[in-house]
Curated annotation (Swiss-Prot):
Provenance organism: Protochlamydia amoebophila (strain UWE25)
Note on domains (UniProt): Domain I is involved in oligomerization and binding regulators, domain II is flexibile and of varying length in different bacteria, domain III forms the AAA+ region, while domain IV binds dsDNA.
Subcellular localization, as worded in the UniProt entry: Cytoplasm
Name of the protein this chain belongs to: Chromosomal replication initiator protein DnaA 1
Disulphide bonds in the chain: none
Gene (UniProt): dnaA1
Length: 448
């Protein structure tokens, strides 16, 4: 039975966590939760979808135990029920068109969403947790959370998986919204065809008026193509003005793309999220999941061995599983460390490590902290530049076998400036978990 006392306890919990998360996170994940029932043994919460349950338990389990009943195992005693779907009220500019019209009007660039790329089978870890949370926020509330959402990271880390997951979720849960998923190359080809067929106006109308969600993969292919960039930039502006959701992926952050300041500004106007290289435990989880999909059993020790030697991206791990699967099925073999060493010999070989340079460190720091290399080399003292600059100096001292005087010269600073930066970062790292993770991401990017 729901009492005012129960409601007060839940309100106190919300007030407590509100001070520990951003307003956007609170609005997306916590505000929609309703207390339905409560006893001394269990609380029933109504949630809009399974992602909210996952977010709540992943981030606030200890806090929930402090406010709500706990079960015999010390876990929060909560029963979750999914709220019945509500009818989506579409703004006037989100007019609907029939499927026959869609077929007739949709350009050839539409990418079919990969059915295997869904939130449910995306393996989450520290380096991609933020990206997944942001993507789920966008999928839950298209056009209202982060717009545009810009996801960047290296090749084969799961950017396309997340992009297609957003598309699937919106199509299944916001059925009246029209989703268009394209690669940048496909958009360019579509525009070329439209110019050739003298149907540019029709293409512009489609992209700017008849789409509610635009998912764009690999925006880096727009570099050095000024006319195409201009067209896509106008499309972004038109969609943003009418409240449509835009999600973009790239192999580098907006600040490092060779695009106009105007286009970069639009991309940086929403949320920029970095997807890093998965750490060892996540790579092992990915391996085990991919193997399970193929009916393979990989002993935990062997999975760790593979993950320790293949760490650049997820795609390489998938390739390793495919090769092992073929050998095991064709030759009727069990997976052992010896078989892995023999079968994946070329994949496990590590290229000789080049000497790490200050330039490498600066580029990696710039990518993770979303600043320009030129700013890191400059003298600006604003916090958003000064902190990453000090991180670069700290990592240079850690990773490069040079004297402080030589490192100072590389940064255009004195050796005492380098020393001060290192001491400052060492002090901050002791208490700042976010900074520790960011430094870890930079280090992994450099070492890989």
């Amino acid at each position: 039975m729901l009492t005012s006392e129960t409601q007060n306890v839940w309100t106190q919990f919300l007030q407590f966590v509100k001070t520990r998360c951003s307003p956007a996170a609170f609005g997306n994940w916590l505000a929609p939760i309703r207390v339905i029932d409560c006893s001394t043994e269990e609380v029933t919460l109504e949630i809009p979808n399974i992602f909210v349950q996952e977010y709540l338990l992943s981030n606030y389990k200890k806090d929930l135990c402090a406010f709500l009943p706990v079960d015999m195992s010390g876990e929060p005693a909560i029963r979750f029920i999914i709220a019945p779907p509500q009818k989506k009220i579409i703004p006037p500019n989100h007019f609907s068109i029939s499927s026959s019209q869609k077929e007739e009007q949709s350009p050839n660039s539409d990418v079919k969403l990969n059915n295997n790329y869904r939130f449910e089978n995306f393996i989450e870890g520290p380096t991609n947790q933020f990206v997944k949370s942001a993507a789920m926020g966008v999928a839950l509330r298209p056009g209202q959370s982060y717009n545009p959402l810009f996801i960047h990271g290296g090749v084969g880390l799961g950017k396309t998986h997340i992009l297609h997951s957003i598309g699937h979720y919106i199509k299944e849960n916001h059925k009246k919204l029209r989703v268009q998923c394209i690669t940048t190359e496909a958009f360019i080809n579509d525009l070329v065809d439209s110019l050739r067929n003298k149907s540019v106006d029709r293409m512009k109308k489609f992209y700017r008026s008849e789409i509610d969600v635009l998912l764009v993969d690999d925006i880096q292919f727009l570099q050095n193509r000024l006319n195409f960039e201009e067209e896509l930039s106008y499309t972004f502006e038109a969609l943003k003005n009418k409240g449509a959701q835009i999600v973009i992926t790239s192999d580098k952050p907006p600040s490092l793309l060779k695009l106009s300041e105007r286009t970069i500004g639009k991309m940086e106007g929403g949320l920029v999220a970095h997807m890093g290289i998965p750490e060892l435990e996540t790579r092992v989880a990915i391996l085990q999941y991919k193997a399970e999909q193929k009916g393979l059993h990989i002993p935990h020790k062997v999975a760790f061995f593979i993950a320790e030697h293949i760490h650049n991206n997820v795609r390489q791990l998938e390739g390793a599983i495919n090769r092992l699967s073929a050998h095991c099925r064709l030759l009727d073999l069990n997976i052992t460390e010896e078989l892995v060493s023999r079968t994946l010999r070329e994949m496990l070989q590590q290229a000789p490590r080049e000497k790490i340079s200050v330039e490498q460190i600066l580029k990696s720091v710039a990518a993770v902290f979303q600043v320009r290399v030129s700013d890191l080399r400059g003298s600006t003292r604003t916090k958003d530049i000064a902190l990453p600059r000090q991180v670069a100096m700290y990592l240079a001292k850690e990773m490069i076998n040079e004297s402080l005087i030589m490192l100072g010269a590389s940064f255009g600073k004195t050796h005492s400036t380098i020393l001060h930066a290192c001491k400052n970062i060492e002090k901050k790292v002791a208490s700042d978990e976010t900074l520790r993770r960011q430094i870890g991401m930079v280090r992994r990017n450099i070492e890989s």
